[in-house]
C-alpha cells in the first residue's frame, strides 16, 4: 500500500495543541505552526481501524494490557532496538515526561543534582527544578553541523550529580548518539554512580543512513523510555513503555509505580500501541523516506535562499535547529520577523537552555512538503528583506 503524506489535513477546531493553541501561545492564530513536535500526517489506518473496532464493543470499562500488547511491544523492541526484553522488565507509562518525573521523585532526594546537555527538550530543564532538585547543564558543541558532547565538561559536572537525563536521539535536531558516545556516557556515569535516564521517544524515527543505538543495549544500569506516540502520530493517547534490565533498580522503581497505580492506561492507548507495533513497519518505512526528503528540501532551500543560517539537520525525527545569528538581528527582531512577517510559529531557542540560544529556533518539518516549502519561502522573504 502506498501512503499519502502530501495530503493536507485541517486540524483546526479539534482542540489540537499545535494549531488551536496558537492564539494563546503566540498572540495570533493566523500563522503556520512548526513548533509542537507532532506531525500533520494522518494517523495510520490500521491504528484507526483498531480503535474503531474497540469502540464498537460499546463498553469502555477498566482495562489492562493484553498479552497481544506485550507481545507486540517486545517484538518491536527486539527488531528496532535490539533489546530482548521480558514482560517483567517493562512497565507501561502514560507518558515519558511523567515517567521521568516519577523516576526523579522515586530515586532522588530534594536538592540532588540532575545533569542535562543543552540545548535540550524544555521539560528536561523544568522537571528537576519543579521537583526540588538542582539542575546542572553541560552545553553541547556543534562540530561539522552536528551536536557533540563536551566530555571534559560532562564528566566534571557528572561527578557531582545523581542523575543524567539523556535525549537519545537528541531533541532538538535529532542527533543520533552512536555506540562509542553512549559507551563513554555509561563509563562516566557508572564511575560516578550517576543514574542514566534515556528518553528514546524519537528512536523509531531514525532516518535512512543512520542507526539508533538504545542505551539499554550499552548498559543495564539505566532507565530507558520508549513510545509509539511520535512514531505513529498518536501522542494524544498517552502511551509509553519503561525498560529496566537491572533487577534491583527495576523492583524499586516499578514497585513505586505500582503503588501509585500507574500500571493502568486508557483503553485506546493499549489498543493503538498494539496495532501500531504489530502492523506499522511498512507505514513507518514510507514515512521515514518522506521525512528524509523533507530534510533534503530544507537543506537545499537554506543553501539557496538563506545561506547565512547555520543548521543542525536531523539524523532522526523531524526537528531541525536553525541559527540565524549570521543576520545580525536581535532576539526580538528575529521573533518579530518570523511570527509577524513570515507568519510562522517556531520554537524559541531560549526555551532549550537560555539566552545563549537567543538567535536559534527549532523547526518542525513533519508536515506535507508543500506546507514546508511555503513556510520556508515566507521565512526567507522576511529574513532577507
Give the positions of each predicted feature:
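N-terminal small-domain helix-loop-helix segment of the aminotransferase-like
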Residues: 2-95, 102, 276-277, 385
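Helix C-cap/helix->beta junction micro-motif
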Residues: 131, 191-192, 342
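Conserved glycine-rich beta-strand-loop-beta hairpin in the small C-terminal domain of fold type I
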Residues: 274, 290-299, 311-324
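Active-site phosphate-binding strand-loop segment of PLP-dependent enzymes
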Residues: 140-210
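Conserved PLP-anchoring active-site segment centered on the Schiff-base-forming lysine
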Residues: 106-128
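PLP-dependent enzyme catalytic core of the Aspartate aminotransferase-like
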Residues: 337-346, 352-385
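Active-site PLP attachment segment
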Residues: 217-252, 265, 359
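Structural signature of PLP-dependent enzymes
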Residues: 251-257, 276-299
Amino acid at each position: 500500500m502506498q501512503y499519502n503524506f502530501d495530503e493536507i489535513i485541517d486540524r483546526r477546531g479539534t482542540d489540537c495543541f499545535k494549531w488551536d493553541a496558537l492564539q494563546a501561545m503566540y498572540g495570533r492564530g493566523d500563522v503556520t505552526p512548526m513548533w509542537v513536535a507532532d506531525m500533520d500526517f494522518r494517523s495510520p489506518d490500521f491504528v484507526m481501524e483498531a480503535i474503531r473496532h474497540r469502540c464498537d464493543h460499546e463498553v469502555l470499562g477498566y482495562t489492562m494490557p493484553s498479552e497481544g500488547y506485550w507481545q507486540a511491544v517486545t517484538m518491536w523492541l527486539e527488531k528496532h532496538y535490539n533489546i530482548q526484553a521480558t514482560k517483567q522488565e517493562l512497565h507501561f507509562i502514560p507518558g515519558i515526561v511523567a515517567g521521568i518525573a516519577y523516576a526523579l521523585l522515586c530515586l532522588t532526594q530534594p536538592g540532588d543534582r540532575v545533569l542535562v546537555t543543552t540545548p535540550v527538550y524544555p521539560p528536561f530543564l523544568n522537571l528537576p527544578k519543579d521537583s526540588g532538585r538542582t539542575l546542572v547543564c553541560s552545553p553541547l558543541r556543534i562540530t561539522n553541523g552536528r551536536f557533540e558532547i563536551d566530555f571534559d565538561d560532562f564528566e566534571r559536572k557528572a561527578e557531582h550529580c545523581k542523575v543524567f537525563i539523556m535525549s537519545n536521539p537528541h531533541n532538538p535536531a535529532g542527533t543520533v548518539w552512536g555506540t562509542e558516545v553512549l559507551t563513554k556516557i555509561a563509563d562516566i556515569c557508572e564511575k560516578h554512580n550517576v543514574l542514566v535516564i534515556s528518553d528514546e521517544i524519537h528512536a523509531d524515527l531514525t532516518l535512512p543512513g543512520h542507526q539508533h543505538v538504545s542505551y539499554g543495549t550499552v548498559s543495564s544500569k539505566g532507565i530507558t523510555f520508549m513510545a509509539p506516540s511520535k512514531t505513529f502520530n498518536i501522542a494524544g493517547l498517552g502511551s509509553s513503555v519503561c525498560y529496566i534490565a537491572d533487577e534491583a533498580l527495576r523492583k524499586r522503581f516499578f514497585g513505586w509505580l505500582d503503588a501509585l497505580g500507574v500500571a493502568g492506561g486508557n483503553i485506546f492507548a493499549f489498543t493503538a500501541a498494539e496495532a501500531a507495533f504489530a502492523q506499522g513497519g511498512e507505514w513507518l518505512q514510507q514515512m521515514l523516506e518522506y521525512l528524509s526528503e523533507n530534510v533534503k528540501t530544507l537543506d537545499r532551500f537554506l543553501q539557496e535562499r538563506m545561506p547565512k543560517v547555520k543548521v543542525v539537520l536531523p539524523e532522526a525525527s523531524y526537528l531541525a535547529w536553525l541559527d540565524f545569528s549570521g543576520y545580525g538581528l536581535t532576539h526580538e527582531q528575529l521573533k518579530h520577523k518570523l511570527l509577524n512577517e513570515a507568519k510562522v510559529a517556531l520554537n524559541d531557542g531560549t526555551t532549550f537552555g537560555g539566552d545563549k540560544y537567543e538567535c536559534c529556533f527549532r523547526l518542525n518539518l513533519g508536515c506535507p512538503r508543500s506546507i514546508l516549502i511555503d513556510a520556508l519561502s515566507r521565512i526567507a522573504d522576511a529574513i532577507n528583506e
